[in-house]
Amino acid sequence: FEPDVEGGYRRMNGYRRFINHIVPHTSSINEKVIGVAKFGDKVIACRGEKIFSAASTELSTSITATSTMSGSGTIVVDSVAGFATSGTLQLDSEKFTYTGVDSASKPNEFTGVTRATESTTAAAHVTRITVSSPWTEIDTGRTNASKYRFERFNYDGNEKLLCVDGVNAPVVFNLALSATDVTTTAIVGSKFVASFKSHMFYAGKSTTPELLNFSIPSNEDDFTSGNGAGTIRVDDTITGIKVFRDSLFIFCENRIFKLTGSSSSDFAIIPITRNIGCING
């Protein structure tokens, strides 16, 4: 069920894949997808020891099973944003290659298309179905990663996505999907992350489960205490952090706190309850 615009709830009409390709695994097909996020024109997915990205759009003009595409075909879609200028596409179970994109045409087009590649069979495709790219590896070596959590932020005019997995160094992606690790020892292994008052807050490290670390203003990777970074300790194991209005709420196993203020000089912890907690934030 989903919320109804007229009030209450309504039954969902169904669902379909947003990306047709299966997320690759690292070493075992039993590995679960442990994180998914939408960032810019891409979809981010985390599985095994790696993080991947892919692009998705919808078909604007139907394709018949008999349409000939042998290097000069076109596929008309809502948008080519996020797709490479040449590459591979998948519609349902059929795969295509293309050699160009036309973002000036309305709707957009993939050009130089060849269909039924990689031993797939030409089939009819109706409008509004998913057109997607293969998954591209954007980060590796994330050994024993658990559930991913994400934070989108913009401190310097550039949109970024920060990912934590509870084990490895947090990783930051810009819109070009270039990865930068946050390697400060106290931050590596953080399970929770939130941007609050232009500081990046990290928590959930297994060796310091009661500790909240925060960066200097407008820099998610600088923890110099003299420049506005610091730590805050609560008297319980942190299970989640979340910004709501002008406060950062800190959920613990048996307690809930909120952080107010705007900088290291006036940050203050206020208890909300000491009798109700949150086992898994």
Language model region names:
Residues 54-57, 101-103, 166, 175, ...:
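Inter-blade boundary loops/turns of WD-repeat beta-propellers
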Residues 28-30, 144-145, 231-235, 275-281:
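Short glycine-/Asp-/Thr-/Trp-enriched loop segments that recur within the blades
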Residues 58, 177, 219, 263-264:
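Short coil turn/linker residues within repeat-based beta-strand modules
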Residues 1-57, 135, 170-172, 186-258:
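N-terminal beta-propeller domains
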Residues 149-185:
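Hydrophobic or amphipathic alpha-helical targeting/insertion segments
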Residues 182, 259-275:
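Blade-edge beta-strand/turn elements of extracellular beta-propeller
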Residues 58-70, 78-147:
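Small/polar beta-strand repeat architecture
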